[in-house]
């Protein structure tokens, strides 16, 4: 089984320069690939795949335009992966899975430096450092987090990323299967919401962390820092004395706050999933939420985005697979909140403001807990 381990690293100044150059080259190549295919389409020519583009780039374009030979200075596997990402983006567009690919803007896009194990000396890992192709040995902040080479583990591939002035490495490692599910245990249903983050059919409720005092304080601070950054840009447009270095410092402050808030939410999701999986249910049933549709509601979009429902589903799927637990996804149109768990009657006139489910049979329960109970016993589902 392949598992990804992500942790912060402490590269030297020389290594930071290489990371910046490689990530910048990957961003340039990705945008170049999109622009070239867009030009081919406008000229009525055939779409160019990633492999054909690399051949054309190395044998036709670069010899003709030697001023772009700096592209070859970057780690070749990272550049190749950037082109592959561009091809994947086009395939998703052609299959009507996403919108037309957008260009990646400097400083605003999540571009990563990909690496892969090519020879035995590459991608070695020790307790306090990891060997990355084109960078060499890099210090790890959390010592012992990534399984080491001495323990018999091998890094297959990975990537280096930057966020808010910090550097991270994500390593893909093959580990033995560790299935802990007990078939004798009962399955559970999980209802996700905005009032509370997750309501489990076993009676456990996980609160909405965005309502905590800590996050509210950070969000207020973020608003102040964003307002300060906006004023600096306004002063620059008016021609007043505002140095660009101060703008960059303020941008970094805003990025760090965004990163801190995001880390708190992600950490809460990880701990919630770990606690759910520790109960060792035979299966877990969740609902197929239409998150993109929910985001179209201007009154709820911010609250929906801050809950990170999609990330919860992806991580729950990975954790369930790791522990041998079957993850079931109920049909998108299954009315889990409107069905009486006691008699099965569908209450069609149930409003979003009705927080308590009351049925004519006398059954009274919290609507979210009632939905979790219904999800636990749903018969129509698909395996995630």
Question: Model-found features: residue ranges?
Answer:
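Gly/serine-rich nucleotide phosphate-binding loop at the start of the catalytic core
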Residues: 1-79
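Stable alpha-helical structural segments in soluble proteins, enriched in small hydrophobic residues
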Residues: 33, 78, 82-93, 367-379, ...
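Ordered, soluble secondary-structure elements with a strong preference for glycine-centered loop motifs
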Residues: 13, 17-20, 77-80, 200, ...
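Long, hydrophobic, amphipathic alpha-helical segments used as structural scaffolds
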Residues: 34-41, 90, 94-101, 175
């Amino acid at each position: 089984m392949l598992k990804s381990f992500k942790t912060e690293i402490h590269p030297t100044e020389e290594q930071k320069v290489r990371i910046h150059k490689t990530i910048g080259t990957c961003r340039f190549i990705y945008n170049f690939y999109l622009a070239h295919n867009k030009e081919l389409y406008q000229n009525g020519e055939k779409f160019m795949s990633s492999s054909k583009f690399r051949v054309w780039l190395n044998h036709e374009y670069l010899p003709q335009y030697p001023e772009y030979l700096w592209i070859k200075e970057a780690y070749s596997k990272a550049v190749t992966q950037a082109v592959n990402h561009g091809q994947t983006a086009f395939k998703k567009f052609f299959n009507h899975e996403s919108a037309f690919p957008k260009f990646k803007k400097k400083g605003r896009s999540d571009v990563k430096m990909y690496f892969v194990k090519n020879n035995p000396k590459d991608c070695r890992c020790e307790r306090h450092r990891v060997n990355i192709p084109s960078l060499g040995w890099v210090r790890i902040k959390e010592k012992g987090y990534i399984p080491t080479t001495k323990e018999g583990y091998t890094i297959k591939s990975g990537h280096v990323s930057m966020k808010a002035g910090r550097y991270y490495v994500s390593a893909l490692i093959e580990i033995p299967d560790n299935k802990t599910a007990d078939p004798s245990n009962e399955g559970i249903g999980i209802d996700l919401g905005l009032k509370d983050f997750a309501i489990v059919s076993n009676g456990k409720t996980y609160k909405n962390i965005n309502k905590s005092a800590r996050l509210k304080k950070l969000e207020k601070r973020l608003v102040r820092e964003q307002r300060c950054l906006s004023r600096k840009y306004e002063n620059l447009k008016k021609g007043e004395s505002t140095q660009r270095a101060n703008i960059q410092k303020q941008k970094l402050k805003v990025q760090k706050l965004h990163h801190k808030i995001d880390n708190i939410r992600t950490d809460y999701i990880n701990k919630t999933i770990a606690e759910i999986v520790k109960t060792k249910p035979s299966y877990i049933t969740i609902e197929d939420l239409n998150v993109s549709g929910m985001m179209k509601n201007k009154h709820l979009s911010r609250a929906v985005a801050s809950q990170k429902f999609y990330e919860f589903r992806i991580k729950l799927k990975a954790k369930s697979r790791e522990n041998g637990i079957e993850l079931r996804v109920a049909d998108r149109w299954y009315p889990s909140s409107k069905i009486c768990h006691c008699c099965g009657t569908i209450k069609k006139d149930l409003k979003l403001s009705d927080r308590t489910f009351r049925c004519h049979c006398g059954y009274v329960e919290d609507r979210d807990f009632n939905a979790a109970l219904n999800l636990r016993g749903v018969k129509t589902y698909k395996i995630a």
